[in-house]
């Protein structure tokens, strides 16, 4: 039986979402296989909740240091040389995490390695002559002038990605590539690049019984505001959204927070009064804003089909789903250069 190692970068949820979509397709290509998963933090916890613990492993790939809103650039750069907030210097982190992954490689004897965002396995697989696939939506992203100091890091990352046997772009082939401005592949590696399309499923995931939220929004026109990303990205996205609400006071909106926290679920009317979703439904409240911590698959499907437009930060996974599957117009309020590039491509 073939053994596959899947390594998932823990910065943001898109890497995990793509890999789970890939898992749904793998049986169409490989009949008998065993998969082991590796990540850390919140993604590790999701894997443990979803799969038997004996096939889920800790992989401490370094991640940026969170700031109040987005990664703290200064602290992340200083962390390359000194400990910051309990994180060892970046060089020590890299050495330790490669040592851990090396042990996993040697103990499991993988026949194939699939990585989404985690570049270390590319190096280990190449050194062991194990075929590897790197799933991505960026290689050498176009940086804006304010981010020139990231360029050496971008070149280093591109060099490690290039060590994969195959590079799978989770996007449509040119000229329909949303992440085009984040790729910029050199000629010498284009032979190993494959465009696989967006890892978004067109399967309808609707329950036969409507939830209270689905009943509450039935027949209304509204915009769907999606907060996505890790904690700091989610926070700054939410802050940017809130700055816009004063300009659209009478326009209905649903805000999904991508956090499994039911205390977030609140309905507001135009006077600012708040209600639970069930109370708002019972009292037939003329709502103006609905905040939801986490939408079920059925609720998300209903919201996307019913909304007039979506507001996003430029997350690649989300853009593929909204534009590719649902064909809804988007309004982009990006946080990072990567997201700005994708929003600009869509606008053009």
Residue map of PLM features:
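Conserved nucleotide-sugar phosphate-binding/catalytic loop shared by glycosyltransferases and other
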Residues: 25-92, 284-286
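Active-site-proximal region of nucleotide-activated glycan assembly enzymes
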Residues: 128-198
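A donor-sugar binding/catalytic signature common to diverse glycosyltransferases
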Residues: 113-116, 297-344
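Conserved nucleotide-sugar donor-binding subdomain of glycosyltransferases
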Residues: 73-115, 119
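A short, glycine/small-residue-rich beta-strand->loop->alpha-helix junction that serves as a flexible
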Residues: 7-20, 232-236
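Glycosyltransferases and closely related glycan-assembly transferases
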Residues: 50, 102-113, 120-134, 327-328
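Donor-nucleotide binding loops and adjacent catalytic segments primarily
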Residues: 201-309, 319, 340
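Alpha-helix C-terminal capping/helix-to-coil transition sites in glycosyltransferase folds
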Residues: 109, 163, 305-306
């Amino acid at each position: 039986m073939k053994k596959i190692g899947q390594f998932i970068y823990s910065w943001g949820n898109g890497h995990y979402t793509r890999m789970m979509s890939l898992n749904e397709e793998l049986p169409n290509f490989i009949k008998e296989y065993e998969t082991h998963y590796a990540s850390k933090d919140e993604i590790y916890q999701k894997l443990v909740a979803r799969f038997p613990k004996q096939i889920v492993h800790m992989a401490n790939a370094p991640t940026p240091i969170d700031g109040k809103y987005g990664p703290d650039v200064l602290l992340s750069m200083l962390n390359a040389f000194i400990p910051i907030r309990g994180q060892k210097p970046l060089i020590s982190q890299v050495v330790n995490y490669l040592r851990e992954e090396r042990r996993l490689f040697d103990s499991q004897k993988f026949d194939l390695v699939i990585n989404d965002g985690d570049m270390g396995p590319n190096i280990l697989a190449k050194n062991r002559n194990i075929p590897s696939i790197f799933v991505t939506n960026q290689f050498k992203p176009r940086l804006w002038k304010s981010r020139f100091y990231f360029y050496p890091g971008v070149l280093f990352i591109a060099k490690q990605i290039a060590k994969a046997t195959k590079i799978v772009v989770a996007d449509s082939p040119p000229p329909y590539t949303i992440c085009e401005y984040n790729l910029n592949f050199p000629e010498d590696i284009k032979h190993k690049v494959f465009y696989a399309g967006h890892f978004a499923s067109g399967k309808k995931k609707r329950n036969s019984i409507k939830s209270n939220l689905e009943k509450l929004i039935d027949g209304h026109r509204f915009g769907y505001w999606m907060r996505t990303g890790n904690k700091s990205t989610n926070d700054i996205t939410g802050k940017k959204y809130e700055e816009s609400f004063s300009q659209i006071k009478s326009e209905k909106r649903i805000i999904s927070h991508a956090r499994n926290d039911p205390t977030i679920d609140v309905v507001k009317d135009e006077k600012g009064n708040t209600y639970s979703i069930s109370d708002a439904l019972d009292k037939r409240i003329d709502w103006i804003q609905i905040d939801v911590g986490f939408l079920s698959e059925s609720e998300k499907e209903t919201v996307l089909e019913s909304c007039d437009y979506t507001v996003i930060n430029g997350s690649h996974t989300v853009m593929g789903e909204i534009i590719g599957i649902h064909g809804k117009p988007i309004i982009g309020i990006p946080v990072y250069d990567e997201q700005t590039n994708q929003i600009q491509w869509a606008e053009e």
